[in-house]
């Protein structure tokens, strides 16, 4: 091709390097084009840019997913993809189907945003490997892993109405050989104020107190065998509707 032949000689002189670490920073939102399915990925850097407290608020800068309130009294939210309601969209937790049945209306608020490493969004009909619900698309959530190097992560957040939220994550090896690792995720929020900015006599948002705790374990053997297990506990109390309603009937029944 018009380039003269060049010969290079390698000599074992100089300094030996045991390893090289290459670090880079991903964009907040990017489209993955090297796979079979074209999809949008929201990285952890993108989640940090948004004041997202839960999964529903993680799609504020996403052009693929829109989130709206399906019930103003209870604060339930639903997603829309390709113009259809969220019942036609499959939500996966590390490729496992979640948010089915009774958890569907409130499942978007049961996953804190700071628990996630990334979110993958693919539009259109997807594979039925994980279920048949993916008609308009799939949303896969990647949580923080037990093998993360970050031993402790603490996040305290206040919104414009001074609603406090606390997120905690700690990952640590249980054994010295790091074959058995675990991670504890905790989230707490409290919104005890009532707001009626349009003065219609109804709360704009429900009063809510929530606590979420998750514990995940990973055992990775030398022969490639991996075992994963864990649990998640959710406790929540919501109060919506008229401004003057204070659960008087419930208190009388106790």
Residue ranges of predicted features:
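Flexible loop and strand-edge segments within Gram-negative outer membrane beta-barrel domains
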Residues: 191-212, 220-254
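Transmembrane beta-barrel architecture of outer-membrane proteins
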Residues: 50, 54, 76, 106, ...
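Extracytoplasmic beta-strand/coil segments of soluble accessory domains associated
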Residues: 56-100, 117
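Short acidic/polar hinge/loop motifs at secondary-structure boundaries
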Residues: 78-80, 96-123, 213
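Short strand-turn segments of transmembrane beta-barrel domains in outer membranes
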Residues: 118-128, 138, 142-173, 206
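Short, acidic, small-residue-rich periplasmic hinge/interaction motif at the N-terminus
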Residues: 2-48, 56, 86
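Outer-membrane beta-barrel strand-turn architecture
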Residues: 145, 174-178, 219-225
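Transmembrane beta-barrel strands of outer-membrane/channel proteins
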Residues: 154-158, 184-190, 229-235
């Amino acid at each position: 091709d018009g380039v003269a032949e060049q010969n290079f000689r390698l000599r074992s002189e100089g300094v030996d390097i045991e390893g090289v670490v290459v670090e880079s920073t991903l964009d907040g939102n990017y489209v993955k084009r090297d796979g079979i399915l074209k999809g949008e990925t929201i990285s952890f850097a993108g989640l940090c840019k948004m004041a997202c407290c839960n999964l529903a608020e993680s799609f504020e800068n996403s052009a693929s997913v829109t989130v709206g309130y399906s019930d103003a009294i209870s604060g339930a939210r639903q997603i829309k993809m390709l113009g259809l309601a969220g019942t036609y969209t499959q939500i996966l937790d590390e490729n496992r189907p979640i948010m089915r049945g009774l958890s569907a209306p409130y499942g978007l608020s049961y996953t804190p945003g700071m628990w996630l490493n990334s979110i993958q969004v693919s539009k259109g009909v997807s594979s039925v490997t994980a279920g048949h619900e993916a008609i308009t698309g799939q949303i896969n959530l990647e949580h923080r892993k037990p093998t993360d190097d970050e031993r402790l992560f603490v996040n305290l957040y206040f919104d414009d109405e001074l609603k406090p939220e606390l997120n905690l994550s700690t990952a640590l090896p249980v054994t010295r050989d790091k074959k058995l690792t675990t991670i504890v995720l905790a989230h707490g929020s409290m919104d005890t104020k009532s707001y009626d900015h349009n003065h219609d006599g109804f709360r704009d948002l429900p009063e809510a107190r929530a606590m979420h705790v998750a514990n995940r374990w990973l055992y990775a053997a030398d022969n490639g065998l991996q075992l994963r297990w864990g649990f998640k506990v959710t406790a929540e109390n919501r109060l919506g509707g008229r401004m003057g309603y204070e659960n008087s009937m419930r208190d009388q029944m106790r």
